[in-house]
Amino acid sequence: MESRFKLKEEYHQSCCAIQVRVPVIKTSSTKRKNQLYTTGPFIMRSSSPSQPPSIKAQHRIAKHKAIRRRRIDLNCGCSIFYHIKCADHGFTHRGEHHCASGREFRFYLGGTKSPLFQDHAGGRSSIHTDKDIPHPNQVQSQPQESTGSPQSIPELPSLDDIDSSFWDDIFK
């Protein structure tokens, strides 16, 4: 078998290599060193790192396995394909959120089963509380707002109280 290519750079356990044209090299072996051995559905590559493994076997397997996808045609004219396993996840396209399932659609638009509009008994906690034991109020009161200046900053004079000679010196 004759080889007209040699590897310029090798990558350990990778299928990528840069090939350059060189003079013909005659090899004594007729078998390729990276021959694939198949045992049922599994493929075992040889451990020789001198040549990159062939990707043809992976492509052959991938052609037989059908990918289950669903197509969505959007109002903007774009088409999106999403995997069946991703059915409960929406996506955003050009700033607009799109729902990928009926359950998610109810969530965003507030259908009857939407968690946004469920009444959960006033937000009570699920922890058992004894009504005979007095509990302090756990909500901290906020200080009342005032229109005056804070205590740490002294009150500044009004800009109207500053005489015009001060402003004349600044804007000369």
UniProtKB/Swiss-Prot annotation:
Q: What is its main location?
A: host cell
Q: What keywords are annotated for this sequence in UniProt?
A: Activator, DNA-binding, Host cytoplasm, Host nucleus, Host-virus interaction, Inhibition of host innate immune response by virus, Metal-binding, Phosphoprotein, Suppressor of RNA silencing, Viral immunoevasion, Zinc, Zinc-finger
Record PTM: Phosphorylated.
List GO terms (cellular component aspect).
Answer: host cell cytoplasm; host cell nucleus; viral capsid
Name of one Pfam family that matches: Gemini_AL2
Q: Where are the zinc fingers (unnamed)?
A: 76-93
Short motif Nuclear localization signal, span:
56-71
Check the record and name the InterPro entries matching this protein: Gemini_AL2 (IPR000942)
Polar residues bias locations? 137-152
For region Disordered, the annotated ranges are: 119-172
Recorded GO MF terms:
DNA binding; structural molecule activity; zinc ion binding
What domain comment accompanies this record? The zinc finger and the transactivation region are involved in PTGS suppression.
Q: What is this protein called?
A: Transcriptional activator protein
Annotated source species: Bean golden yellow mosaic virus (isolate Puerto Rico)
